[in-house]
């Protein structure tokens, strides 16, 4: 009984610390995601993602921040990108992966959160591209405790060679994925990756965007 009692006490005292330590180093992969697109190439398309999340612009969070994982006491620990690069870079790479799979020739362009819209559009127009994609993150973060909640607000625009917007799609909302209590860390990684793939498909397969990406006759 005495040994059982000490074992229970050890779990109660050390368990939350172990959970917190795991949360502290948790990471999510974005750069490896590939969406399934309805449109196909050829065509040379430049791609950039602009991070306009307020806590990144205010430098309260780094550009690698993708969400939080909470301890048993509900204390939040930051979750960051798997490759330690900015989230925007990972999303740019994921869009490029998706375009390449469908026969396009993507040109990833990595930009700072503090770069102006005009400057980014000029960067996208370089290199004799047929189209350009600019993804703007107004919000993107997950929050995991008993469930995983994904907060998102993103805008995708397609520009032609003259830097004119010829296609646009915005999605925003709050998605809840129950079941994180079983294994919070792995649950969050799985559902967020799947949700990100789905959001990319919702953006890129939107009729206005897909038509804008089609090569000119």
List the model feature ranges, each with a label.
Residues 23-35, 112-165:
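Surface-exposed short loop/turn segments
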Residues 96-117:
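Short beta-strand->alpha-helix linker/helix-N-cap micro-motif
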Residues 1-10:
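Bacterial N-terminal signal peptides that target proteins for export
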């Amino acid at each position: 009984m005495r040994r059982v009692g000490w074992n229970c006490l050890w779990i109660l005292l050390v368990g939350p610390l172990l959970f917190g330590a795991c949360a502290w180093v948790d990471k999510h992969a974005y750069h490896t995601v590939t969406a399934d697109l309805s449109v196909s190439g050829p065509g040379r398309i430049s791609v950039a993602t602009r991070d306009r999340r307020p806590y990144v612009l205010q430098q309260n969070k780094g550009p690698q921040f993708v969400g939080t994982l909470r301890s048993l006491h509900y204390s939040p620990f930051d979750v960051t990108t798997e490759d330690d690069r900015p989230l925007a870079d990972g999303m740019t790479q994921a869009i490029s992966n998706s375009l390449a799979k469908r026969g396009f020739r993507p040109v990833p362009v990595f930009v700072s959160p503090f770069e102006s819209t005009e400057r980014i559009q000029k960067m996208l127009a370089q290199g004799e591209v047929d189209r350009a994609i600019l993804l703007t993150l107004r919000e993107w973060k997950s929050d995991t405790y008993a469930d995983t909640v994904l907060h998102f607000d993103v805008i995708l625009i397609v520009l032609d060679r003259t830097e004119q917007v010829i296609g646009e799609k915005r999605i925003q909302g709050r998605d809840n994925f129950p079941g994180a209590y079983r294994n919070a860390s792995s649950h969050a990684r799985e559902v967020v990756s799947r949700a990100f793939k789905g959001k990319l498909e919702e953006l890129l397969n939107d009729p206005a965007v897909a038509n804008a990406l089609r090569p000119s006759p």
